[in-house]
Amino acid sequence: MGSEQRKDPRVPSYAKAVFLDRQIPGYIRDLSRSGCRVSFMQPISAGVGDLITVQVIAEHDPAIAPFTVRLRVRRIVSDVLWYSLGTQIEAIVDPKEAEAFDRLVSYYSTTSGGK
């Protein structure tokens, strides 16, 4: 696999995610301040360039409140088990949700040796 070329390198992570338009469950698989990979258990109705809204639930740390994030789909990869989207963070409007997002990124950046 090639070397990481993102401005904000992604780190392995794990948090529950729900595609809000259809209540489809999934998981955040990697994360950075500018994007994430979200894997769903079934295909969702979004294509490259579309905006989606996902609720993120950090079960590992109840101090991190669930938050909602708008994501721009940049890549779609489908296999037998997962429908994965490479996404760019588009918006987190609420300051408390932005704080929860920052805490989640910091947690995984620290635990996986990221920046």
Regions found by a protein language model. Name each.
Residues 1-36, 102-115:
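N-terminal helix initiation/capping motif
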Residues 8, 41-46:
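Short, surface-exposed secondary-structure edge patches
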Residues 15-20, 49-66:
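Short conserved beta-strand and strand-loop elements enriched in small hydrophobics
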Residues 22, 33, 76-82:
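Short, conserved beta-turn/loop elements at beta-strand boundaries and strand-helix junctions
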Residues 25-28, 67-76:
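Short beta-strand-centered aromatic/proline hotspots
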Residues 39-43, 88-91:
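A structural micro-motif recognizing beta-strand termini
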Residues 59-61, 76-78, 92-94:
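Short coil/turn motifs at secondary-structure junctions
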Residues 80-115:
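C-terminal output/interaction extensions
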